[in-house]
Each structure stands twice: as C-alpha cells, then as structure tokens.
Amino acid sequence: MAVCIIDHDNIRGVIYFEPVHGKDKVLGSVIGLKSGTYSLIIHRYGDISRGCDSIDSPEIFIGNIFVNRYGVAYVYLDTDVNISTIIGKALSISKNDQRLACGVIGISFINEKIIHFLTINENGV
C-alpha cells in the first residue's frame, strides 16, 4: 500500500493507493478546494522542495475528483498503476494545468488507524 499526504495552503488530504479485491484502487479524501472537477496526476520525481513548482512534467493521469459545495472530495478510483513503481513520485491535484496542491507518495503499512482532519478558524479554534 502507498499513501500521499497533501498539505498545501488550506488544501489537505490523504490519498491511498491499495489493492482491493484484486484490483488497485485510489482512495481518500481532500478538503479545502472550491467545488468543481480536479485532476489527480502522478509526476516522475518527488521533488517538492519548492512546493508544486518544483515537480516535473505529468507522467500518469490517475483520474478526476469531484469537490462538493462544502469543499470536500471523496476519492474512489480504479487504476492500472503498479503501486510499487510510484513510491517516491509526486502526486498533484490540478485544474486547468495549474498545480494547486501536491505531495510525495510513500510506503504505508496497513493498520487500523483513522485519520481525522482538523480545521482551524481565524480565531485558532
């Protein structure tokens, strides 16, 4: 299993790449985007030293995600990507060829942990 943590400005999410019933799936959620359609794209290298500006050209289009009016996208996509070949590569969330958020895909162990998103308002609460 592989995982990518997205944390860029107000955009946050967790994207998992995992086998489910013999097929590879892309699962997760993202918050903080405006409603609409966005693309999930894997890039050849995982250099995010200058944020999303430092990742190279797109390599693999994973699919589109749909953000609801509350700014939440629930991700459940089929993929033909071999999970072992994407470790260390960058994943971006893009719209109209603009990279809005990104992260590096890493190895994840299967466990029973649940990740909760915490949003903080302008008062720090």
Curated annotation (Swiss-Prot):
Keywords noted in UniProt: Disulfide bond, Host cytoplasm
Molecular functions per Gene Ontology: metal ion binding
Disulfide bridge map: 52-102
Name of the featured protein: Cu-Zn superoxide dismutase-like protein
Compartment(s) where it occurs, according to its Swiss-Prot or TrEMBL record: Host cytoplasm
Family of the protein in this entry: Belongs to the Cu-Zn superoxide dismutase family.
Keyword Disulfide bond assigned: yes
Chief site of localization: host cell
One cellular component term from this protein's GO annotations in UniProt: host cell cytoplasm
Gene Ontology biological process terms in this record: superoxide metabolic process
Task of the protein: Virion protein with no enzymatic activity.
Residue spans crossing the bilayer: none
